[in-house]
C-alpha cells in the first residue's frame, strides 16, 4: 500500500503561515522589556536619573550617581543612602538618595556650602553658646555595632591607639559628652565587635558603594578634598519618624592627610584622629553639618588641623542628638 501523501505546495504554504502567526502570538508576552528610560553606560548624574524617575523602569540599582563631586551607588527599593564628607576647607560636600518601595527616586542636598573663612572660628559663637544643629532624618534605634578595619594605619598610630580614639569618639556621641554642663539625655548605644578584613564600602573617589551589612571604620584613600567620609544606609522606620540605620561606614583619608592621636605644639597640619572621629560618629548617629558661622561646633564641616576642640560636643551638637534620641 502506498504511503499517505502530505499536503501539496499550496497547503504547505498555508500551514507555514498559520504556524508563524501562532508563534508570533505566543511570543508576545516573552519579548524583552525595553526600559522606559534607557541609561547611558558609566557613571550617572542626578540629571540622568532625576527625582521622580524609577529604578525599576530605568534599571539603575547598583549604578553610581554623582552630584557636586560626591557619588552614591543606587540602593534597592525601600532604602536611603547618604554621603557626608569632612573637608579640609570646611565646605559641606554630600547628598542623599532615597529609593521608595515602588522604585521612585528622590534626592536631598546640603542647603549651602559652608565655607570656612579666615577668622571664622574667632567670630563664631563659643561652642556652649551656639544652639545650631542639623539632623539627617535617620537614627540608630538599636545598638550600633561596628568593626575596625585591619588595613594600614598612619605612622605612629597603633591599632590599639586607633581603636581607643574611635571608641572614645563614639562614646562622646552616645553619652553626649560636653563641657557645657548639659546632662546626658541621649538614649543611643554602640558596641565595637572586632577587627575585620572587610573594608568600608567607600571608594577612593569618596563614593558610597553597595553595602555589605557590616559597619566598618577604616583608613585609606579618598578624594583629595575629603579628610574623612561617612556613608550611611537606612530604611523607613515601622512607626514613622527618622529612618532606621542599617549600616554606617567611616573612612579616614590617610593618603592625602596626616593624623595624630596627640597634637602637640609642634603640630602644623596633622588632624587629631579623635576629633575627626567624633565628627564622623555624629553622622553615624544622624547629625548633619553645622553651617558657616558655627565653626566651633563639633559638627561644623571641618575639624581643623592640630585642634582637639571637636573631641567634646557643643550645645548645638547635644541639642541635635536630643532631638533624635528622646
List the predicted regions and their residue ranges:
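Secretory targeting and sorting signals
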Residues: 1-32
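Metzincin-family zinc-dependent endopeptidase catalytic domain
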Residues: 162-276
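Disordered inhibitory propeptide/activation segment of secreted metzincin zinc metalloprotease zymogens
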Residues: 31-155, 235-237
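Extracytoplasmic/secreted cell-surface and envelope-processing proteins
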Residues: 155-157, 260-263, 285
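Catalytic glutamate of the conserved HExxH
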Residues: 276, 280-284
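Metalloprotease/metallohydrolase-associated module, dominated by Zn2+-dependent proteases
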Residues: 32-58, 62-69, 79-81, 238-241, ...
Amino acid at each position: 500500500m502506498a504511503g499517505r501523501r502530505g499536503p501539496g505546495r499550496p497547503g504547505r504554504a498555508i500551514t507555514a503561515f498559520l504556524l508563524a502567526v501562532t508563534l508570533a502570538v505566543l511570543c508576545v508576552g516573552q519579548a524583552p522589556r525595553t526600559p522606559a528610560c534607557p541609561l547611558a553606560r558609566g557613571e550617572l548624574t542626578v540629571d540622568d536619573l532625576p527625582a521622580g524617575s524609577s529604578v525599576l523602569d530605568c534599571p539603575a540599582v547598583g549604578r553610581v550617581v554623582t552630584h557636586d563631586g560626591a557619588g552614591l551607588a543606587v540602593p534597592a527599593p525601600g532604602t536611603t543612602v547618604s554621603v557626608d564628607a569632612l573637608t579640609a576647607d570646611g565646605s559641606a560636600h554630600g547628598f542623599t538618595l532615597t529609593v521608595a518601595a515602588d522604585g521612585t527616586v528622590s534626592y536631598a542636598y546640603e542647603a549651602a556650602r559652608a565655607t570656612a573663612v579666615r577668622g571664622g572660628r574667632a567670630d563664631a559663637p563659643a561652642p556652649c553658646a551656639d544652639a545650631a544643629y542639623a539632623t539627617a532624618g535617620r537614627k540608630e534605634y538599636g545598638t550600633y555595632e561596628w568593626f575596625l578595619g585591619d588595613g594600614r594605619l598612619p605612622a605612629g598610630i597603633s591599632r590599639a591607639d586607633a581603636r581607643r580614639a574611635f571608641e572614645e569618639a563614639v562614646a562622646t556621641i552616645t553619652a553626649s559628652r560636653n563641657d557645657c554642663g548639659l546632662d546626658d539625655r541621649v538614649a543611643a548605644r554602640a558596641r565595637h565587635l572586632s577587627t575585620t578584613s572587610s573594608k568600608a564600602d567607600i571608594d577612593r573617589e569618596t563614593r558610597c558603594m553597595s553595602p555589605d551589612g557590616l559597619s566598618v571604620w577604616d583608613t585609606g584613600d579618598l578624594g583629595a578634598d575629603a579628610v574623612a567620609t561617612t556613608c550611611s544606609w537606612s530604611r523607613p522606620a515601622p512607626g514613622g519618624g527618622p529612618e532606621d540605620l542599617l549600616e554606617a561606614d567611616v573612612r579616614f583619608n590617610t593618603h592625602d592627610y596626616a593624623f595624630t592621636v596627640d597634637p602637640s605644639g609642634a603640630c602644623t597640619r596633622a588632624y587629631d584622629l579623635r576629633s575627626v572621629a567624633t565628627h564622623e560618629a555624629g553622622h553615624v548617629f544622624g547629625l548633619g553639618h553645622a553651617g558657616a558661622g558655627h565653626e566651633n561646633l563639633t559638627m561644623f564641616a571641618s575639624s581643623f588641623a592640630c585642634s582637639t576642640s571637636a573631641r567634646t560636643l557643643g550645645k548645638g551638637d547635644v541639642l541635635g542628638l536630643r532631638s533624635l534620641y528622646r
